[in-house]
């Protein structure tokens, strides 16, 4: 058992799907429903990113357990006619190697996507390309968002597909998916940790809704099933799913009246949210929810089409059939720009995490005389280092990778059979939650060097130094306040390209209550702005399949420059030193050396240096 923190789910029984059996069972459902194909996602009814295997139909039908990726399951007749396996899996560049490793090519065809196409675009294009063999296609209305469905319908219009909504968990039942049940309490975090009361959050929400719709008070309803929306608005936490401090449920707000609906699976959770008396908790009883909502004379319904499932929207339409629906969720923007109280909690959390990571990477580098260490040991070591600093949960399964495994961008196997090998790259990507429930995240790489005569190979020094240069470029550049996330990505990525390398993922993701947060993003073409007081990663990487990979990830606060209000700068809140055995000083310019000298000096002061810096 790797994760032994307070809110881990390590005690749950493992779920190891038999892909042969699940595919046979779903094939029978398709035949009975006269469907040629069905979409299979890795989302739950809350459109959650990280799902446990037991609630992930995509894993059950393919064997692939990465956090992102969807698929199309074909009936036996359709698969035979097309000459392909029954499951077509679509994955982005982070998971090409992992999908190859985990999937049986006789049962799963892997569609490897590049940077310029999304999973949902690729699935739609595949359906159109094979439309002559497809007539009726199903989708799980509880596991697909409104925006995903709308784009899918629009992009496949030319194929004239007959779409069938499956809203009663038909796929889950057919493949005997265990699902997810949690009974953990939903509790408040103090206002001192968030900087805003629940009443202030709801006032801000209603102000933005009124500005968007122009409707009088009480005529606009808002709802969301995004668990970090709930946690933000209600100053609440629950740790209801692995690697997330938030809690499950659907939230409905009309003016000052708020309903927290707990559907099957979380309906037994105790709720102790006492600071907002107008909160109504409704458990499992859909009729009771409809009775609560029906008296409101709602003319507008606002929600994020990207983050609300189709079945929930269909239920809302039954309550307010004449209301106009708007794709508007202001909570994402409200969450992105953090209060000073929240930023203080982030700084504290990253100070603790930085100390844990530096301690663990020193251990990973030098080892212990005469002791064999494995990837599993490394994952355990960072878990225990976090625990020693009062962490309560991991923010994602720690990526502890040795040698060639470090070339898997999201490798999570952490094998007890893979030894940390002398002279190989060792990568650790990890994060933790502390009492306030805000996520941390950081990646560092070291050269395993238990003997003084071990030296880095030229290719190892090259990719490490180039990735470091790219990261520094993102950290120190002053950007105009009008810049977009795509501009930051392009600048960082170009450093790698100038040296003949690139990486198949974005440069940065928002960080908040969840380790991946919307509202800000550094990725090719990203149109999110550089939101002041947002927290976001800067994490270029270089991956050489079969050899090894490097990713250097720091987390920054976007700050408006007081002296130049039209300029933003980045405050790095990670202080974990670098491995100077892997840095080619000849590749560094004077500015990069000066930056690293100051950074390593700070790490020395805080006790978070990993190796001795020759510049000091």
Describe these PLM feature segments.
Residues 1-616:
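Active-site neighborhoods and metal-handling regions in enzymes and metal-associated proteins
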């Amino acid at each position: 058992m790797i994760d032994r923190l307070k809110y881990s789910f390590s005690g749950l029984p493992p779920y190891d799907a038999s892909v042969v059996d699940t595919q046979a069972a779903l094939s029978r459902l398709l035949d009975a429903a006269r469907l040629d194909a069905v979409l299979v996602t890795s989302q739950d009814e809350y459109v959650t990113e990280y799902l446990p295997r037991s609630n992930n139909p995509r894993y059950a039908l393919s064997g692939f357990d990465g956090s992102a990726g969807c698929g199309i399951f074909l009936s036996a007749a359709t698969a035979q006619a097309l000459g392909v396996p029954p499951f077509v899996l679509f994955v982005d560049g982070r998971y090409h190697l992992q999908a190859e490793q985990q999937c049986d090519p006789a049962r799963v065809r892997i569609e490897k996507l590049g940077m310029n196409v999304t999973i949902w675009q690729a699935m739609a294009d595949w359906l159109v390309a094979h439309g002559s063999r497809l007539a009726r296609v199903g989708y799980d209305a509880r596991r697909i968002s409104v925006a995903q469905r709308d784009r899918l319908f629009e992009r496949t219009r030319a194929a004239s597909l007959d779409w069938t909504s499956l809203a009663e968990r038909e796929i889950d039942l057919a493949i005997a998916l265990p699902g997810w049940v949690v009974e953990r309490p939903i509790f408040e975090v103090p206002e001192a940790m968030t900087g805003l009361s629940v009443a202030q959050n709801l006032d801000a929400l209603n102000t933005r809704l009124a500005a968007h719709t122009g409707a009088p008070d009480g005529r606009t309803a808002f709802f969301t099933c995004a668990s970090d929306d709930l946690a933000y608005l209600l100053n609440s936490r629950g740790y209801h799913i692995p690697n997330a401090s938030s809690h499950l449920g659907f939230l409905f707000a009309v003016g000052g009246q708020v309903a927290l609906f707990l559907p099957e699976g979380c309906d037994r959770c105790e709720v102790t949210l006492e600071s907002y008396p107008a909160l109504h908790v409704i458990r499992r009883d859909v009729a009771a929810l409809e009775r609560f909502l029906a008296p409101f004379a709602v003319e507008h319904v606002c929600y994020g089409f990207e983050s609300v499932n189709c079945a929930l929207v269909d239920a809302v339409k039954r309550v307010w059939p004449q209301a106009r629906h708007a794709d508007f969720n202001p909570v994402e923007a409200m969450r992105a720009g953090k209060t000073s109280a929240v930023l203080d909690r982030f700084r504290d959390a990253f100070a603790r995490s930085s100390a844990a990571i530096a301690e663990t990477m020193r251990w990973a580098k030098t080892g212990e005389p005469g002791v064999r260490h494995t990837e599993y040991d490394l994952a355990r070591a960072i878990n225990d280092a976090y625990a020693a600093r009062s962490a309560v949960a991991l923010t994602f399964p720690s990526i502890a990778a040795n040698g060639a495994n470090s070339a898997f961008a999201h490798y999570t196997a952490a094998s007890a059979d893979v030894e940390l090998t002398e002279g190989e790259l060792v990568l650790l990507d990890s994060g933790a939650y502390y009492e306030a429930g805000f996520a941390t995240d950081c990646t560092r790489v070291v050269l395993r060097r238990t003997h003084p005569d071990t030296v880095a190979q030229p290719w190892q020094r090259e990719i490490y130094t180039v990735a470091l240069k790219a990261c520094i470029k993102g950290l120190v550049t002053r950007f105009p306040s009008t810049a977009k996330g795509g501009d930051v990505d392009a600048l960082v990525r170009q450093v790698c390209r100038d040296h003949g390398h690139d990486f198949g993922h974005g440069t940065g993701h928002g960080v908040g209550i969840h380790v991946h947060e919307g509202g800000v993003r550094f990725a090719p073409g990203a149109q999110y702005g550089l939101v002041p007081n947002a927290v976001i990663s800067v994490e270029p990487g270089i991956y050489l399949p079969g050899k090894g990979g490097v990713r250097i990830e720091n987390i920054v606060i976007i700050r408006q420059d007081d002296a130049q209000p039209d300029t933003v700068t980045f405050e790095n809140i990670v202080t974990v030193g670098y491995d100077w055995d892997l840095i080619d000083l000849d590749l560094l310019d004077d500015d990069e050396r000066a930056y690293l000298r100051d950074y390593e000096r700070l790490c020395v002061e805080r006790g978070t240096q990993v190796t001795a810096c020759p510049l000091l």
